[in-house]
UniProtKB/Swiss-Prot annotation:
The lineage of its organism: Eukaryota, Viridiplantae, Streptophyta, Embryophyta, Tracheophyta. CDD domains: MPN_AMSH_like. Its EC number is 3.4.19.-. Residues 146-162, 214-224, 232-242 have a biased composition (Polar residues). It comes from Arabidopsis thaliana (Mouse-ear cress). The keyword Protein transport applies. Its cofactor is Zn(2+). One of its GO terms (cellular component) is vacuolar membrane. It is found in: Membrane; Cytoplasm; Vacuole membrane; Late endosome. This is AMSH-like ubiquitin thioesterase 3. Residues 73-107 form a coiled coil. Residues 133-162, 214-242 are annotated as: Disordered. It is a peripheral membrane protein. A motif (JAMM motif) lies at residues 411-424.
Amino acid sequence: MKIDLNKVAREIEVDNRIPLRNYYRIADNLLRQASIYREEKNVVDLYIMLLRYSSLISETIPFHRDYQASLPQERLGSRKRLRAVINELESLKPEFNQLVDKLNRVEDESRQDGSDLPVVSYSSDAVEWPPAHKASYSRPDINKPLPTSQPSWTYNNNLTSSSNRTQIDQQFQKLSFDFLPPNQATLSRHSFLGPNGLKRQMVAPKSEIKVQYPSNTDWGSADNSGLIEAGPSSSSASLNGDSQEVSTLNSVLSLDDGRWQRHSEAVNSQFISDATEDPFQFVGMKQPSPPPVLAQVHQELAQICPSKVADPRPGPAIPSLEGKEGSNSYQHLHVPVRIMDDFLRLARSNTERNLETCGVLAGSLKNRVFHITTLIIPKQESTSDSCQTLNEEEIFEVQDRLSLFPLGWIHTHPTQTCFMSSVDLHTHYSYQIMLPEAVAIVMAPTDESTPHGIFHLSDPSGVSVIRNCQQRGFHPHEESEDGNPIYEHCSHVFLNAKLKYEVLDLR
């Protein structure tokens, strides 16, 4: 599909609830992605990451209320890197224009022929999962050779663009090195508190709405559809040394049933340093490209009464080609099949005491595909319906030391159903701001109909709702402006039976 720079590199609205340090971490992650794309000679994504970095440093971070008062070294360092980024953008601009023009010509020719460009997987041996709107699915023969595809610059967003050169020029015109302190009017426009700041009248939830977790009986029965597995896994050892039953891989791996393989092989990830002369000096990781399975989630869930719980029903997974105008184009994310069951075993003692457990998902990027390679169990405080991580800096230290991207989080609902509460949505908002591809995995072992789900905030609908919500604790949310669900099942996630990962328990 055509690349619209106004959307794939759009300005990020500042949220003063997010610490300024986290915004600089977002900038560092963008440069790390750019470093990987530079090494892989991926000019299109390299250009987009550099453009996002430029926008973040010049158009978002300076409007944070703590920008002038804190982190002076980060402020000076980011401005120095911005100069190098703009110089590289200028040098890449002609080649980027040529590649984009070529992509657009190919698409135009395809449309004239009356055919659509295929959805291309950026990993070899990928198994295409049927579109979410199809009512019935057929299971492939796992003994047949898996289809392969070569890396392509086809983007899976439903975007339209006029002149990409005009968009590029407009992006450059926005960039400036002279960051003057913003006046009060500017701050009020960019503040999540609105023009009235702290004086704004808080809107309390309606008194007749009672917010609580639903019981399992609130869910109606659903005809669960399964996932297509990528084929038998190679032999692997479990975390505790037990042998595996290969036959379980021949069952349907569904996010709506509980038949996951129980163990995983814990293997330390291999890392390499960027050998090229990179002014940003970030470390990339090399990972294998095993056969994935698209994490399609059944979408016909029985509706929960709105009086019982806030945001009870997620939206269905929307394939990229059917995405809404202005939505993000997410890069694929591979999740180890066994990581969910292993997490449940690690959380068993808390679950038996009706306490939630949470973990942080982190991993690598290779060939436009994110891979979850590390499950971090942080120090935490738990209740029956909440879980709070402690010592966030320790988590950041692990991610930085191992050069890992923050790819989301996972947590349990010991006795509740599988859904995202209002507290969960606010928690995931911080992850998705850090990286749009980040996911939230919910494990509900007592929910027989939907024991697990992989979700994220809809963008821009859900992200906007949570950004503008100033309430805390369990509360209902206003409906999004376009009427779309606040959160939805992920369409960019693949379950990978061969992906290896390690567990770091910091408790």
